[in-house]
Amino acid sequence: MCKGIFITATGTDVGKTYITARIIKGLIAQGINAGYYKAALSGTEVEAGKKIAGDAAYVFRFAGIKGEPNQAVTTMLDYPASPHLAAQMENKRITLAPIIQDFDRAASIYDYVVMEGSGGIICPLNLEGTTLMLVDVIKALALEIVIVADAGLGTINSTLLTLEYARSMKIDTRCIVLNRFDESSAIHCDNKKVIETMTGLEVLVCGVQGDLDILLIKKILLANLLDSI
């Protein structure tokens, strides 16, 4: 039976793709058949004359996933904007059915699917006709989430807002990861302590050198999948 997790963030460019890649690489190193999936990617790149899904390609390389990265993304959009706007500009429409189909395909290949979101948790995928938001996808797939946030000043507000929105939408959060964490920073250490106290959730850290406690990640994410961690 496939299990999965959805990686979201407090915003754009806080390190969601990097954390996703580290989690998958760590799980694979622990003997877990883990894979990657993303519903929509904005801002394709060109490599060796071929259009590629940059985030997916990075994760595949970093984590050592075999296969074609572009096949791990349902909708690839050239314009680097919110998926709903990029799709509108390219005369495309993002709908739920293909996303579910592609996630199920990934679930047939991997025992654990790490799905990366686009931007933050409040991300529109389609606003023309039937509205489709990222939370609709998370709920349709019945996934829990990991919230990635920057460790610096302002993260208490953005992290708690993201968490409370998820809770209001009946989406469970498995843990929070503070990225670019500097243990010598009083602000970073206090942010971690305050967020743990105010949320009751485990707050993990990814240091400035990119270290992440993958054994703890494994225990948190796979608690319901494995009889023994």
Annotate the PLM regions.
Residues T10, A39, D150, L178-F181, ...:
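Cofactor-binding loop segments of dinucleotide-utilizing enzymes, especially the Rossmann-like FAD-
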Residues K51-A57, E164-A166, K192-I195, L221-N224:
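Short, hinge-like loop/turn segments at secondary-structure boundaries
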Residues G4-A9, Y36-K38:
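Short, hydrophobic/glycine-enriched beta-strand segments
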Residues C2, I32-N33, A106-D111:
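Short, high-confidence coil segments that cap the C-terminus of an alpha-helix
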Residues I23, Y112, G117-V203:
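Conserved catalytic-core segment of NTP-binding enzymes
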Residues F6-T20:
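Glycine-rich phosphate-binding P-loop
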Residues K192-L225:
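C-terminal binding/interaction regions
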Residues Y18-R93, A97, D102-R105:
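N-terminal phosphate/diphosphate-binding loop that engages ATP/GTP or pyrophosphate donors
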